[in-house]
Amino acid sequence: MIPSSSPAIETRALRKVFGDKVAVGDLTLSVERGEVFGFLGPNGAGKTTSVKMLLNLVFPTSGEAYLLGGSLNDPLVRSRVGFLPEHFRFHDWLKGTEFLALHAELYKMSGQQARRRIADLLDLVSLTPHAGKKLREYSKGMLQRIGLAQALLNQPDLVILDEPTSGLDPVGRRLVRDVIRELRRDGTTVFLNSHLLSEVEITCDRVAFIKHGQVIRVSPLQSLVEGELSVEVRARNLRPEVVQGLSRWSRSVRLDGEHIALTLEGEADLPQVNRYLVEQGVDVFALRPERISLEDLFIQIVGTDGGL
């Protein structure tokens, strides 16, 4: 019996070393049941190695990891996890229905149960008209969608998706987003490893930023994207001491002629900044606030050197 009160994913100082290279260093993470969790980092940051350790495809050098409150080696736990890898090679001589039926057999599903589930999933990923085609005839996007159907075949409690929108057109990406939202509504936990930050921004509840194999920040997505504001001010009579005084609201203030760029913690600071400038005799012509995108936050948190 899998305990339902335990986190969907829990790691403690999980570490993987290949020779003299630390791929993942002291990964400590907790993903709650029913949330969509984004795992973000540049190439080479250790994301895929972390996923492989969670799936017991790569053994950790040290540390602990649990899925759904149980051991990674527990067959019952493994049977409640669905996985879509970034790079896959499916049996391309099989038809779409045959491919899913093969995996249904591996899950020991009854014939009637398998047929019903396969029909539902083909409809979910919009592949019903192509169910009789061999996988070698599928486009990259169609293969991605049949892979997603395979990951959901066992109605898992935890779904791990590694770059699920890779190779998809805008319609396909929207379909994947809709599937993820439906999984959330059903209480399924989704662990999303993606470099498409715009997709993460739309779908995730919380995100973790990983760099050099270590988690450097975990935060609710809403507090990230609704928090800081990037503000551009166009004004005259800007004396150096006045510009310096803006540091009480912003840790980053840049002056370029009649333009000031600063970062505020929230909208509540806007009237105070405007009032301060006017009281200092500054002629304010424009004050333009703009939400910082997840991409900009990613660069701020992870840096421009990426995972190298």
Model-assigned labels for residue ranges:
Residues Y107-S110, Q280, D305:
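Solvent-exposed amphipathic alpha-helical surface segments
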Residues V207-A208, Q300-G303:
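Short low-complexity, flexible loop/linker segments enriched in glycine and/or proline
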Residues S230-I301, L308:
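Short, charged/small-residue-rich alpha-helical element at the C-terminal edge
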Residues S6-T11, K16-K211, V215-R217:
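ABC transporter nucleotide-binding domains
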